Every structure is written in C-alpha cells, then in structure tokens.
Amino acid sequence: MEPLHKDAETAAAAAAVAAADPRGASSSSGVVVQVREKKGPLRAAIPYMPFPVAVICLFLNTFVPGLGTFVSAFTVLCGARTDLPDRHVCCVFWLNIAAALIQVLTAIVMVGWIMSIFWGMDMVILAISQGYKDQGIPQQL
C-alpha cells in the first residue's frame, strides 16, 4: 500500500506545480539542476597544476606519502590556482604543508598512505578538468 501513497504524493505535488505555473502545465518546461561539491579547506587548497606536474605529484605521493603534496604546496607559490580564491597565497601554502604533514604522520597506520594516494589522484583529476576548461572542450559525465 505504501507505493500508492507515494504516487498520490507525487501526483499532488505535480498538480500544485501545474497550478502555480501561470503558463499551465507543459511537458516541455525543464528544470536546471546545479550540483556543487562542498569542499573542506584542506581539500579546497589542492592546486590546479599542469597535467605532467600533477602526475609527478601522484607518483611521489604513491611511493613516499606526503612528498607530492609537499611539492604541490610550492606550486601555489608559483601561481597555481586553488578553490580558495579569498585566502592569501601563504595561507593556502601552509594548508598544503599541513596536509602533507598529516599524510606523513599517519602513514604509519596506512591511513596517511591511502590519503596521500587519493590526494594525488585528486591533483590529476583537477589537472584534467582544468585542461578541459582551458580548451573549451565539454566534459563527458
């Protein structure tokens, strides 16, 4: 009986939307949905680097946890953009250094090593997405 109740709620919601729409209910009216990822300050401090640099940082993070993140901190000082435009460059640099230290200190219990590898993968993903934006090529989802 529960599915019928949900169908009734859906139908009632659709009727309310149609009644509120001054143009009447039209099947061609679309809804634009925007999805935004909420990132914490450490995650948002990952810089958008050129693809080869991001791959090098991934390899460094894979074999020596935190080393690639440490190198990426210096790319911020060289002008790499981050998702923290309102923060000063030095603040973003120190956030990356903090992330590298967390990765090094927790590598003993494997948490830091896994975090370091994921951090490197995020760097490569950001480099690829930035490359698509620079070239104006639409990304496939």
UniProtKB/Swiss-Prot annotation:
It is found in: Membrane. The chain crosses the membrane at residues 51-71, 87-107. It is a multi-pass membrane protein. Keywords: Membrane, Phosphoprotein, Transmembrane, Transmembrane helix. GO terms for cellular component: membrane. The modification Phosphoserine is found at S26. Pfam families: Spec3. Signal peptide: none annotated. Able to rescue the walking impairment phenotype when transfected in mutant flies lacking the stum protein (AC Q9W2E1). Belongs to the SPEC3 family. Stum subfamily. This is Protein stum homolog. It comes from Mus musculus. The gene is Stum.
